[in-house]
Structure formats: structure tokens, C-alpha cells
Amino acid sequence: MKVSDFYYDLPQELIAQEPVEKRDMSRLMVLDKETGKISHKRFKDIVEYINKGDCLVLNDTRVIPARLLGEKEGTGGKIEFVLLKRINGDVWEVILKPGKKAKPGARFVFGNGELKAEVIEIVEEGNRLVRFEYDGIFEEILDRIGIVPLPPYITKKLDDAERYQTVYSRYKGSAAAPTAGLHFTLELLEELAGRGVKIAYVTLHVGLGTFRPVKVENLEEHKMHSEFYRIKEEDCDKINSTKQNGGKIIAVGTTSCRVLETVGDENGIVRPQSGWTDIFIYPGYKFKVVDSLITNFHLPESTLIMLVSALAGREKILEAYNIAVKERYRFFSFGDAMFIK
């Protein structure tokens, strides 16, 4: 299967540059994966499609202010770090810009010297492992001097950083938001719970690999970046009991979907665990846990459009995307939503 099989033509002006005023008033395309039938709704109408006894699975990660602007110790040359993932303790994998010359031993300073970093290793794709040095609590320093990194296709400044967090975000660690969840309000979640829908959580810390283009033509050769995930016992219990009672498992976002498919056994049973996943889901994949998916509209030729194509079929997805373009839906992180039922 070729990467170019997942291309569609998207006018630039349909890339949403800011969120809609009220989270649950974004548009919602409902796609029936069996029949291909499409309905046009508002996101708040999602309650019509989720039944008592179904289980909604949300990713409760929180985006960290992962962009750091600083300078090289000694020369004062400007540098930008983007934190990708914590390897252990104070060692992180980072993207450096400009970073070609940063050899092991190179040192950088951020925020009036309250945070320092030393390159300890060059890793794949030119990223660096760095060790941070500081007094106090790393997360608090990051909150003070870091910037939330918006996706490269969003050029407008975000007035309210909380709009790039889900209302249920809890565990800090992502370089990008799990954007399907941005449409939910607390009131909408309460309404679903009141209707007898179970709400379960997983954690997957989203890396910037989610925006990386697929560089191979045969997608079977593509290797995903690994991302940290965790699923707890109480959430496994909700998911497993839903399955046993004939309810549907509805993943909110490709990140939740990837966790569930990573941890599910051949019978669709999930067990509490944590680790790193590099699962790559594309057409031909047989889903073990996930029945339905709430997601945004994804970039052409991205691993995310491949994942939704695995669930609904490539032709149905590309047809739905072409209709979304005609109907002037808003695309990508701050855009509208799709429910694949």
C-alpha cells in the first residue's frame, strides 16, 4: 500500500487557525462505517449516537509548555528546544533549532540561567538527548519559562492556552494535544454519564511524531515514534465489562485508540499496564478493542488518516473528506470532528 493512496486535496483556508468559541459547537460529521452514510451535525449532538452501556475512552494527558527559547553558553547564539519525551529523570529527547552543530558537551541556558542543559547524545533524526540542570521543581520552571508548542500549520497566536488542553487533562507530558477531546465540555460529559454512558481514561503522552510526514513510499516500511502510555485497573474494568455486556467501546481520538489496541489481547480484553507504544495502524489491521472513533480531520498522507481508514475503509474516508472539503468543514487540530460509528 502506497502513502500516496491517502492523498486528498485540501484548500489552505480550511485549516482552522483558532478554536470555535464554544467547544461543543464545532461541526460533527457522522460516518456509518458499514453503509458509508454521512450526516452533518454539531458536536453536542454526539449524545444521540452514544447509548447507555457504551464506554467512552478519553486520553487524560496534558500538554506541557515544551518549547524553550535560550542561548548557547559562551557564544550567546540563539537556540530553541522542543521537548519530545522524558527518557528518565532529567534526561529528555529534544529537537534543537538550529541544532546541526550541537555536539555532546554543548551547553545551553534558558530563563536567566534558572535552567541549563547539556547535550549528552545524538539520536535518530538528529534529535538530541540532553540533561537538564536546575534548582527547584522542573515542572514549575517549565511552566514559568516554557511555551506551549502549537502544530506547524497553526500560524495564529493562541490567546488562551487552555483552549489547547482538554477540559479533563490531568497528567502532564504531551508535546501536542489529543485534539479529538477538545470538543468536549464538562457539561457534555456529565450529560453522557447521566444517560448511563461509562467514561474511562487512558494516558498517552503525544509526541511531535504525530506531525511528522511519512518519508517512505510503501507504508509498511514506516516506523512510528514510541510514546509513553498508561491504563489503570479501574478503567480496564469499565472497558472489559462494557465488552462483556455488548456495549460499544468508543475511543476519543487516535491516541486513545492506539493505547487500547496496544493493550488489548486477541479477545479484546485490556489489562492495567504502562510502557511505550509504537503501534502503527493502517488498512488491513483488525481492531480488537475499539468499535467506534471520535476524531478530527487529519493531514493528507499522515499516519492518522491511515488509522481512520483502517477502521472505516480508505474509500469511505476519502469520500467523506472530499465531502468535508465541499461543505467547508474546518480541518486539523482546531477543526471540526468526525464520528466513525
From Swiss-Prot:
Residue stretches spanning the membrane: none
Any one GO MF annotation of this record: S-adenosylmethionine:tRNA ribosyltransferase-isomerase activity
Catalytic function, reaction form: 7-aminomethyl-7-carbaguanosine(34) in tRNA + S-adenosyl-L-methionine = epoxyqueuosine(34) in tRNA + adenine + L-methionine + 2 H(+)
Documented EC number(s): 2.4.99.17
Domain of life where this protein originates: Bacteria
InterPro entries, sorted: QueA, QueA_dom1, QueA_dom2, QueA_sf
Pathway: tRNA modification; tRNA-queuosine biosynthesis
GO cellular component: cytoplasm
Transferase listed as a keyword: yes
Keywords per UniProt: Cytoplasm, Queuosine biosynthesis, S-adenosyl-L-methionine, Transferase
Biological process annotations from GO: queuosine biosynthetic process; tRNA wobble guanine modification
Annotated compartments: Cytoplasm
Chief localisation class: cytoplasm
Xref: Gene3D superfamilies: QueA-like (3.40.1780.10)
Main function: Transfers and isomerizes the ribose moiety from AdoMet to the 7-aminomethyl group of 7-deazaguanine (preQ1-tRNA) to give epoxyqueuosine (oQ-tRNA).
NCBIfam families documented for this protein: PRK00147.1, queA
Family: Belongs to the QueA family.
Assembly behavior: Monomer.
Protein name (record): S-adenosylmethionine:tRNA ribosyltransferase-isomerase
